UniProtKB/Swiss-Prot annotation:
Its cofactor is heme b. This is Cytochrome b559 subunit beta. One of its GO terms (biological process) is photosynthetic electron transport chain. Keywords: Electron transport, Heme, Iron, Membrane, Metal-binding, Photosynthesis, Photosystem II, Thylakoid, Transmembrane, Transmembrane helix, Transport. This b-type cytochrome is tightly associated with the reaction center of photosystem II (PSII). PSII is a light-driven water:plastoquinone oxidoreductase that uses light energy to abstract electrons from H(2)O, generating O(2) and a proton gradient subsequently used for ATP formation. It consists of a core antenna complex that captures photons, and an electron transfer chain that converts photonic excitation into a charge separation. It comes from Microcystis aeruginosa (strain NIES-843 / IAM M-2473). It is a single-pass membrane protein. It holds the Pfam family Cytochrom_B559. Belongs to the PsbE/PsbF family.
Amino acid sequence: MASGNPNQPISYPIFTVRWLAVHTLAVPTVFFIGAIAAMQFIQR
């Protein structure tokens, strides 16, 4: 994607590990930001 070389898709074995590492951090982060943002609007 960064280097325009469509003949070698095999040069991305790290893509799955990188996707997994990004999403294991990004998914709970988005969840907690959404939960904290929702708590701002809850009046007791």
